[in-house]
Every structure is written in C-alpha cells, then in structure tokens.
Amino acid sequence: MATIDLDGPALAPPKGEVSNLDDPPNQNCLAYTVLILCAVITTICFLLRAYGRVYLLKKFQTEEILTTLAYGNYWGAAYATFKMVDTPGYFVHQWNVRLKDVIPTNYWILIFGVCYSFVLPFLKIAILVEWCRLFVPKGTRTKSIFWWGCMVIGFVQATSNTAIVVALNMQCNPHEAIWDFRIPGAKCWDLHKLQVASATIHLCCDIAIFLLPQQVIWKLKMSWKKRMGVSVIFGLGLLACVSAAVRLAVTVKYGKAADALYALAPLVFWATAEMTCGFFIVCVPCIPKILKETGVIRNIKRAFGMSTAPTNPNTADRYAKSGTKGSQLSSTGPKSYYKLDEDGVPLGTLKGSESTEYLRGNVNNGQGITRTTQIKITQDNRSTSDSEGHAAFPASQKPWGV
C-alpha cells in the first residue's frame, strides 16, 4: 500500500502555481464579518421573540420549544463554521492546504450539515404551528385547506430532514471514515446527490410557506391597507426563498468543483444566511407588540412632531369634545382621578368636577349634550345640599369609588 504524504498539498497545484502551505492567501476577515453578523442577527431575533412571547404575552407554547431547539442547533452549526476559519480557512485553494488538515475540515462539515438539518425544520414547523393558531379557529381545522397545507409541509420537513440526518451519518462504513480518509477498507457513497436533494426540498417548502397564507390574509375582514401590511409581514418568507435558491445553486456548483475547499465558503455562507432568515421570519410577528409595549412607536411619533393622542372616539377624543361644549363646572374639593373605558388610555387628572357624559358612550351620535352632572365636594363629613340643588357626597362615599 502506497504511503500518503499528509504534510503535502491536498491537491496538485495547477501549472504556474506554487503551493503555499504555511501562510495561504484567504478571506477570513470576510468570513468573520459574515458569520458574526448572522450570529448577532439570529440572537437578536431569538431574544426579541422570547421577550415578546414569554415576557409580554406570558406564553410558552410548542412554537417556543421548537424555536429554542433551533437556536441551540444554530450555535452547533455556527461553532463548526468558526472552527473552519482556523483550518483550512475560507476561500483557500485546496493546493494551499495540507492533506492532514482536510480531516478536521471534513468533521466540521459533517457537524454543520447535521445541525443545519435540524435548525430549518424546527423553525419552519414552529412557523406553521403559529400560523395555524392565528388563521384556523378550533373546531374547523380539518375543514381548512390552509391547515392541511401546513400539515403537509410540516410532515415533509420532519420526515425528509430526519432521513437526511440519518443518511449523513451513514454515508461511510465505518462511521469515522466520513471525515478520516486514512481508515482502510472504508466504503462510502457520493454525498452530493443528498446535498442537492436537501437544498431542493427546502426551496420548495419555502416557496409553499411564502404562498400559503396569502389567500387567507386577503380574505380577512379588515381594511385594504391593513391586509397589505399583514401580507407584507408574512411575505418576508421571500427572503428565505432567495437564500434557499442561491444555496441550491452553490450546492450544485460545489459538487462539480475540482477545488472543493475553495467552493466550500459560499456554500457555508448561504446556508448560514438561510438559517438566519428563518429566525428573522419567526421574530417579525412579535415586533409590533414589543414596539407598542415599550413605547417606541410613541417616542418615534414625538420625535417627528406627530400627535400621540389616542384616535379612538370612545376615549380621549370624546372627552376632549365634551370639554368644548361650554359647560362651566367648579369644585371646592381636591383633585379627582378617573380611568377611561378599556382602550389602553392612561389615567388622567381632572381639575374640578367635570361632566361625566363621555363615559356613557356616543349615544346621540354627536347631536349635543343631553344632561350635565355637577358635583360639589365639601370638607366635612356631613351630607348637605347646596342652594342650587346639586348632589353632594361625604368624602367616605365618593360615587366614583376612589
């Protein structure tokens, strides 16, 4: 058996090229930028969803479990990508890599592929489960085409990726031969067809997930503008379609490349971007709730000089109108506080006794004031009546319950 020079180049250099095994040219700075950026975006999206769903909405459902599992596997894949920065490096020609350095590279490629094959189905099934909660009422699920569509896509994702993970770990016998080519008598099969099949399945599922909710959204009973906004939010799945399509293209190119290590870099980048897009899509529905609860929208409006007053006529606007009708009310008692009906308007302060007609709702459709109630508060505990017949109440029996 011929001996293998493990310290020699992994590929014979082309004519006019000389192997540089000690300090090969690379683009590791670009790799760090792409990988760190994807990791930061993924982490921010995961934390935003956790804050919006678990902290604000007090919900920890199946979607949160799946998203957490996906995030854990994402870092398994990310760890493998960072390890490949050291050996062999990104955009390094194979003739500039020692043959022995291919062994750990093959190992980290296997780890990345397995984790990647867990991340995407976890995320996509989480998205589908959440959409079923939003768009399909209980008791009507088996009658809904949308629900069955979600079930079919989820089933395809679960079964196909389980099979892919099994196949990745059974591509060679013995198992160690997957990454260590030095093992004698090993039997392996071509992995490229499996990689292309995986990329094709994910692209088809991404397109189906992108199109699936559009018909349901445009049948919702809401204004055209709101339907457009909801459609855009759920249409962000187009990002996943683009990244999956490019990933499929670079996968096909990778299988045909003679310089496989050099062609590995774009494949890793686009697969990582595809996972990041998945986390972004999972996070987006939680952002409006977070912006509302944290007051970000209110602060943005103030920064641009826009009004932050509520626009619901059943609350503050109705009160403002009642204050312009010319009713002159007075009080000798302390300030009173009130709470409007449940429209999210904060407590306000009334200086003096004022009309409470706005609490009754817009009964006469804005046709004028039908009754005005005046309250006078005295400083003692006796129930009295003034000369104008206004009702007075002891401090311990305030009718507004404060």
Swiss-Prot record:
Q: Gene Ontology cellular component?
A: membrane
Q: Which UniProt keywords apply?
A: Glycoprotein, Membrane, Transmembrane, Transmembrane helix
Q: Note down the stretches annotated as region Disordered.
A: 312-335, 378-402
> Which pairs are disulfide-linked?
none
Could you confirm whether the keyword Transmembrane helix appears in this record? yes
Q: How does it sit in the membrane?
A: Multi-pass membrane protein
What domain of life does the native source organism fall in? Eukaryota
Q: Where are the transmembrane segments?
A: 28-48, 109-129, 145-165, 232-252, 264-284
* Cellular compartment(s): Membrane
Record: glycosylation sites: 381
Q: Carries keyword Transit peptide?
A: no
Positions with biased composition (Polar residues): 324-334
Which pathway is this protein assigned to? Secondary metabolite biosynthesis
Q: What does this protein do?
A: Part of the gene cluster that mediates the biosynthesis of the tetraketides fugralins such as linear fugralin A and cyclic fugralin B, volatile compounds that play a role in the asexual reproductive cycle but are not involved in pathogenicity. One of the key features of fugralins is the presence of a double methyl group, which is only rarely encountered in fungal secondary metabolites. As the fugralins cluster does not contain an independent methyltransferase, the PKS FGR1 is probably responsible for adding two methyl groups to the same carbon atom.
Give the similarity note.
Belongs to the SAT4 family.
UniProt name for this protein: Fugralins biosynthesis cluster protein 2
Q: Which organism is it from?
A: Gibberella zeae (strain ATCC MYA-4620 / CBS 123657 / FGSC 9075 / NRRL 31084 / PH-1)
